[in-house]
Amino acid sequence: MNACLVGIWLWLPLLFTWLSPEVSSSWWYMRATSGSSRVMCDNVPGLVSHQRQLCHRHPDVMRAIGLGVTEWTMECQHQFRQHRWNCNTLDRDHSLFGRVLLRSSRESAFVYAISSAGVVFAITRACSQGELKSCSCDPKKKGTAKDNKGTFDWGGCSDNIDYGIKFARAFVDAKERKGKDARALMNLHNNRAGRKAVKRFLKQECKCHGVSGSCTLRTCWLAMADFRKTGNYLWRKYNGAIQVVMNQDGTGFTVANKRFKKPTKNDLVYFENSPDYCIRDRDAGSLGTAGRVCNLTSRGMDSCEVMCCGRGYDTSHITRKTKCECKFHWCCAVRCQDCVEALDVHTCKAPKSPDWAAPT
């Protein structure tokens, strides 16, 4: 075997390590783990040592993160509800989403961003609600300040989002920082974009004091917006995600297509094009769209033509009970009648088996 072939064989393991990353965010599985904090910390697979240390040291924060997993997965499913891939989760898989996130696609970019944002939101909310020993309301929001409406006093409980961001960065990014490959850098970038998205919608709320609400004095505080705003924002970033390649020294990205702008810290980035998600593909992590409900009158992604990938659809005639003819009665009730509504439900056909697979 010549020296060239020897060199190729030596580099192949490194090449496959570079191109075939594992799904690193095993902490997502905390949603499905119950019991004491020690049991949880020791039984969530894939946590690195720093994550386990934080888990043992801050069991109350871990409970908040675990509750937050349910919230951001529901938000992910809401955003993808009309798409072929609908952010479906797998209860028995510690990666939560299965093999679909092994591909460095824009779906992976969104999930890492929304999960990181969900941790910030969950921790910050728990701080304000007095559920955590390590934090409370934002200690910096004290005294008097000014805005375009004049002078006001900081009061109430300002959301301590800086603590939420700091803890989320330390916990969520810990495993990625141990890696030096392209996927780790992609995940770190999208994690940061998710954290920044939550802070983007931090808003100032105020209460007036004075005779007849004259607002002689104002008390203000900072509050996070509903998580739906963060989800909607990251959905727009998903649709505008930028495909990138590693730069020559392996420390950052450059755009794959020179016609597109360089990604900012707020943008989502990805390396690989997405599969079409039309058929069940175990290796790609795709569940396919057979049996999915589609919209016969839509022209969007939820249309029967797009959702069913041209395979056609089945129509079922169903009835359901609804409230109708509602009337307001003084005071203070709304009374409705029970009505039966008939409607058609359209579901995607399964792919046809090839002729050679048909029974004889």
From Swiss-Prot:
InterPro entries named among the record's database cross-references: Wnt (IPR005817), Wnt2 (IPR009140), Wnt_C (IPR043158), Wnt_CS (IPR018161)
Subcellular localization: Secreted, Extracellular space, Extracellular matrix; Secreted
GO annotations of cellular component type: cytoplasm; extracellular space
Main subcellular localisation: secreted
Presence of the UniProt keyword Glycoprotein in the record: yes
Family to which the UniProt record says this protein belongs: Belongs to the Wnt family.
Protein name: Protein Wnt-2
